[in-house]
């Protein structure tokens, strides 16, 4: 793989992995606010899947970049994350949460699907495996959408006005898709423009049907001003401090609890052979 293609490939994979990483924490945060025990267990399962996908991609990229294990999760700051900017704003209500997560799930899948038949070894298998789990996420969210109250549906229509333009911007424009070196080299097996169209035809059309919306002409697109193409977000933007603290806590007790498994295992290995435990009472 050419060095330029390698850098672009890593950046694109991080856009997917980091968006999954943030979305997984959305599910964790909202988990105890479910309307029923079934809701809570569903969010727990979706969080587990989503964070599992993010960490699998992190491990894959750490191998690609010859980085130490867990570097991508614990070794970056909030300004280095490639997440979808839409997820930086917390949900205002239940309807907003459903709209935002449904949009995010659909967008992640369509972007990931552009690597489904990649010439890069190992990528296609991950896409197929992740796709099966993401399908059930979307089914669950569709069920919540269809069973929503009239009040929640109005909240969803309002949320569409703010959430959808940011999600569409994530796919960037036609010109970038046409000049994509990853597509021409076969690393990406279908174009981002095709992914954007599929996102509109599937995810957005389902939302419009569920919300009895005739069209989205009232939704104003966002111009790509000072756009960071590699991170697919506004240049210089970073995760809000409260969201980042929830993802990577800094207080001492939580840091101990959130240590990578490899570190925890090393700390406890041969515990009784250590000097501090070798003295008789």
What are these regions (language model features)?
Residues 1-14, 75-101, 118, 151, ...:
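Acidic/His metal-coordination segments adjacent to aromatic residues that form catalytic metal sites
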Residues 8-15, 34-53, 97, 122-135:
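Alpha-helical scaffold segments that form or flank carboxylate-/histidine-based iron centers
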Residues 13, 43, 98, 127, ...:
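Hydrophobic packing residues in well-ordered alpha-helices of helical domains and bundles
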Residues 18-21, 48-55, 102-106, 128, ...:
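Generic structural signal for well-ordered, non-transmembrane alpha-helical segments
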Residues 23-45, 107-124:
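Helix-loop segments that flank and shape redox-cofactor active sites
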Residues 47-75, 141-146:
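Conserved alpha-helical segments that form or flank metal/cofactor-binding pockets of metalloenzymes
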Residues 86-140:
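Internal, conserved structured core segments that host functional sites
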Residues 154-281:
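Extended, helix-rich structural scaffolds rather than catalytic motifs
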